[in-house]
Design a protein with these regions (language model features):
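Bacterial N-terminal signal peptides
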Residues: 8-15
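Beta-strand-rich interaction surfaces with strong enrichment in secreted/lumenal proteins
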Residues: 39-41, 69-73, 83
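Asparagine-centered strand-capping/turn motif at beta-strand->loop junctions
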Residues: 53-55
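Bacterial N-terminal signal peptides that target proteins for export
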Residues: 1-7
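Short beta-strand/loop motifs in extracellular/secreted proteins, especially
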Residues: 49, 59-61, 103
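Sec/Tat signal peptide C-region and signal peptidase I cleavage site
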Residues: 18-22
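Structural beta-strand segments of beta-rich domains
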Residues: 39, 47-51
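Extracellular/periplasmic metallocenter environments
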Residues: 23-28, 35, 74-110
Length: 110
């Protein structure tokens, strides 16, 4: 019985995502017609944050940012999450790699 309780406690401890706190800022981006809306988002510098990207297009898109060192494929008509930061003050570009001519934007950390 004690082993089962210990095992349950260990599994529960690792099941909670790191950084999933109520005070973690969350920002939403929508991909529609192969464009990010909004295409510019101001975020707090020095904080870890979550980007929730909703792809309203029927085709997949890859959120890609060399500046943020992140990439994530988001299938059509679905959502994805990207965790970034803490960020230094500055501008961080991102694109939708499959439609880079139109799907582009930036985070501005202040």
């Amino acid at each position: 019985m004690k082993k089962q309780l210990l095992l349950s406690a260990v599994i529960t401890a690792f099941a909670v995502p790191v950084g999933a706190r109520a005070d973690t800022p969350e920002y939403r981006l929508v991909l529609q017609n192969h464009r990010f809306v909004p295409d510019e988002v101001t975020v707090p510098a020095g904080k870890r944050l979550k980007l929730v990207i909703e792809n309203r297009d029927p085709t997949p898109e890859e959120f890609d940012s060399y500046d943020l060192r992140r990439e994530k494929v988001i299938t059509g008509s679905s959502k994805g999450e990207v965790w970034v930061g803490p960020l230094d003050p500055g501008s961080y570009r991102f694109i939708g790699e499959y439609h880079a001519e139109t799907a582009k934007g930036r985070l501005i950390a202040k």
